[in-house]
A protein has these predicted regions:
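Bacterial N-terminal signal peptides
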Residues: 10-19
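Short helix-loop capping/hinge segments that flank enzyme active sites or metal/cofactor-binding pockets
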Residues: 109-122, 191-211, 369-378, 421-477, ...
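Short glycine/serine-rich loop segments
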Residues: 223-347, 493, 504, 508-527
């Protein structure tokens, strides 16, 4: 224990002193000379880390501190773009856990008879499954849908502030190509010809990838993200790069504040702000968002969309902005649960580049045998709901009517708030160059809770404490597995207790979907959590709940 504390003070003090000198440009190749370190410098520095070594012990570490600082300068002389990951890879799989290995045919619900509306704009809120059937039967063309959605993006996008870049030329080319292929009998599947948008942290060749931030608003990354490539291979049509909260926080970006289509006075929440807003407003067939800590769940709740946050290690982040290498996840934001299944089926799987990915089958089947299904619910969180409690209680009523035998459960009791430093430290590393160059001063939000201050504050997190937090995270993963081995899926208030933070740390998948409306007329949501790599069963259960309600069929009145 003494040795660990000794190492902690070394790294803690060096972490502090490393930010005292003037800002060093990342491009500098020659390390700067190191300022001598004295006890007078080290003594107050240790207090910030909660340490209390006497002067004799501090004196004995001074030489080591200088050597460490020299090492830091050598590292800082190397340019590390955002897309370079750390060599340490996060593993969400608990000891003894086994996921399904056998791949089975993907099954979707029969489309039934889908009638084309007389006015093509009335198709704007159709599900992906419905649009796919119209395209497959050549009742409507991809080009017709694409033009309709492009017109809506131009008409409603400015007021919602949900679009960064229209990829109009690309979209029209892709739509025409889709129509040609389908006319020749080369139908690629249910996403063929479907127009969509992506959160503007996914790179698209030939277009800006702004990350929602002033310092990057003219950035062009000359590659297509893996998710973009896979959707293109599925025949989908990319129409727009959609807004995101600056560097994946909130709904404020360099061009404004993305709006909730149900209430324009509200922001859409974030950080997948434009993806949720545009999908809810019927400006795209579906969209792609990301989540590190609530960025699919929160805007989907605010805007009334259905979102899937997949298991960590399911969807490639290649070509996506990194915020937290051990917590970032990419998933669809749609109008229905089954739409999420269709999109997820196209984007999941290893790509040979993102080394955190696992090859696990996605055996989706919408049928559910409630007699064999073990469904848990967070009893304490449901009992503690204050606002909109009747809505939350109605979720349990619906599930019981469907045949679910609900099992009350409790989440593991560990100091989760302390683990937030994992995200803070990784985010600070991902944007180290931005901070040390001083360009973080260009960012829109500069209050204490915004990224610039968070990045600076996180330089005071000792490396030892970051590692210790991840050791506690390991315990959390094992404890969560003890809970999940007895249930298949559990339901939770989307913002009830520690569930959102906990499951983002453990990597468990989540489906968030509307479950009602407030008295002000804005959507509310409920979340379903599944086994690691258990998206198939999770989506099937969530679909059963959604089919028993009609909240997803209601749409906002838009302002021009």
């Amino acid at each position: 224990m003494k040795h660990r504390a000794f190492r902690s003070i070394i790294l803690a003090i060096v972490a502090l002193l490393s930010i005292v000198p003037a800002v060093y440009p990342r491009q500098e190749k020659k390390p700067k000379p190191i300022t001598p370190i004295t006890i007078e410098m080290a003594e107050p520095a240790q207090k910030i880390m909660g340490l209390n070594f006497d002067r004799a012990k501090l004196d004995s570490v001074l030489e080591n501190l200088v050597e460490q600082l020299e090492s830091f300068e050598k590292i800082r002389s190397i340019s590390l773009p955002n897309n370079i990951p750390p060599a340490i890879l996060f593993n969400p799989i608990p000891v003894g856990f086994q996921f399904e290995r056998v791949k089975k045919p993907f099954k979707m619900s029969p489309p039934g008879k889908v009638v084309r509306a007389k006015n093509i704009e009335d198709l704007a809120f159709y599900s992906v499954g419905q649009l796919a059937e119209l395209i497959r039967t050549r009742t409507v063309t991809s080009e017709q849908l694409t033009v309709m959605y492009l017109n809506r993006l131009k008409k409603y996008g400015p007021k919602l502030e949900c679009v960064v870049t229209l990829t109009e030329d690309l979209a029209l080319r892709q739509a025409k190509q889709a129509d040609k292929e389908i006319a020749k009998g080369k139908y690629r599947g249910p996403l063929h010809g479907i127009p969509f948008g992506v959160k503007d942290l996914l790179s698209v060749k030939g277009y800006k990838t702004t990350w929602g931030s002033v310092p990057y608003k003219d950035q062009v990354i000359d590659e297509d993200a893996t998710v973009v490539k896979r959707l293109e291979n599925a025949g989908a049509v990319l129409m727009a790069k959609l807004t995101m909260g600056e560097l994946a926080m909130g709904d404020v970006w360099f061009g404004g504040k993305t709006r909730n289509p149900w209430n324009y006075k509200q922001g859409s929440s974030g950080s997948s702000a434009g993806a949720a807003s545009a999908t809810a407003a019927g400006l795209v067939g579906f969209s792609i968002g990301t989540e590190t800590l609530g960025s699919i769940v929160s805007p989907s709740t605010r805007c009334g969309t259905t979102g899937l946050r997949p298991t960590y290690g399911r969807v490639s982040r290649t070509g996506a902005m990194a915020l937290s290498w051990s917590m970032d996840k990419i998933g669809p934001i749609c109008r229905t649960v089954e739409d999420c299944a269709l999109v997820f089926n196209a984007i999941q799987g290893a790509d040979g580049v993102d080394q955190t990915l696992y090859e696990a089958p996605f055996n989706y089947d919408p049928k559910v045998d409630w007699k064999k299904l073990r469904v848990g619910y967070l009893k304490m969180e449901f009992d503690s709901v204050r606002s909109n409690k009747a809505i939350s209680d109605s979720v349990l009523t619906v599930l019981r009517k469907l045949g679910a035998q609900l099992i009350p459960i409790e989440l593991p009791k560990l100091p989760l708030d302390g683990l937030r430093i994992i995200l803070s430290a990784e985010a600070a590393a991902a944007f180290d160059e931005l901070t040390r160059s001083g360009k973080d001063d260009l960012m829109v939000r500069q209050m204490k809770g915004a990224w610039p201050n968070s990045f600076r504050s996180s330089r005071f997190i000792p490396a030892v404490e970051y590692i210790e937090a991840n050791r506690v995270r390991y315990l959390l993963i094992q404890e969560m597995q003890k809970l999940m081995k007895d249930i298949d899926v559990y339901v939770a208030p989307s913002f009830g207790g520690s569930n959102l933070l906990l499951t983002n740390l453990t990597g468990h998948p989540c489906v968030v979907l509307p479950d009602g409306f407030t008295k002000e007329g804005t959507p509310t949501s409920i979340s379903f959590i599944g086994q690691l790599f258990g998206e198939a069963k999770l989506l099937a259960v969530a679909k059963q709940f959604q089919d028993a309600t009609d909240y997803h069929l209601k749409h906002p009145k838009l302002q021009e």
